[in-house]
């Protein structure tokens, strides 16, 4: 009986860590989804600006640089490994929407995993009491 309780306590501890990691992954993916939405909106807004229009571009940590719009019909899109590809507005938005869908599916899978882990944690809690 004592070994069984020890085993359950160990399993509980491992599952609690797994649940925390799943929650972090879900939160990160949701943050990335919000960034993708923001990028899509920015692309659409920029594409409607006239050539030469001055804008502020964020550099980092609340620092901005003034820039002028040139050739807003093409955008450089990061596709991974520091590789940029020139895409039209429609292509860029399509790429970002695909990325958003992949992230949404990841969130769904991780939520399912988290629900299973939480269910097992509850089983352990009820069996220990």
Curated annotation (Swiss-Prot):
One GO-annotated biological process of the protein: protein folding
Q: Which organism is it from?
A: Thermofilum pendens (strain DSM 2475 / Hrk 5)
The record's comment on protein family reads: Belongs to the prefoldin alpha subunit family.
* Highest taxon of source: Archaea
The SS bond pairs are none
- Segments crossing the lipid bilayer: none
Q: Which gene encodes it?
A: pfdA
Primary residence: cytoplasm
Return the protein name: Prefoldin subunit alpha
- As recorded in UniProt, coiled-coil segments are none
- Subunit structure as annotated in this protein's UniProt entry: Heterohexamer of two alpha and four beta subunits.
């Amino acid at each position: 009986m004592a070994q069984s309780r020890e085993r359950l306590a160990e399993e509980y501890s491992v599952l609690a860590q797994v649940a925390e990691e799943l929650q972090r992954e879900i939160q990160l993916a949701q943050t990335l989804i919000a960034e993708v939405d923001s990028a899509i909106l920015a692309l659409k807004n920029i594409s409607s600006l006239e050539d030469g229009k001055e804008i502020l571009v964020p550099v980092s940590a609340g620092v901005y640089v003034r820039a002028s719009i040139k050739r807003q019909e093409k955008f450089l899109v990061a596709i991974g490994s520091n590789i940029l590809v020139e895409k039209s507005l429609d292509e860029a938005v399509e790429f970002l929407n695909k990325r958003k869908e992949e992230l949404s599916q990841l969130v769904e899978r991780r939520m399912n995993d988290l629900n299973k882990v939480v269910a097992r944690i509850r089983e352990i809690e009820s069996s220990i009491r």
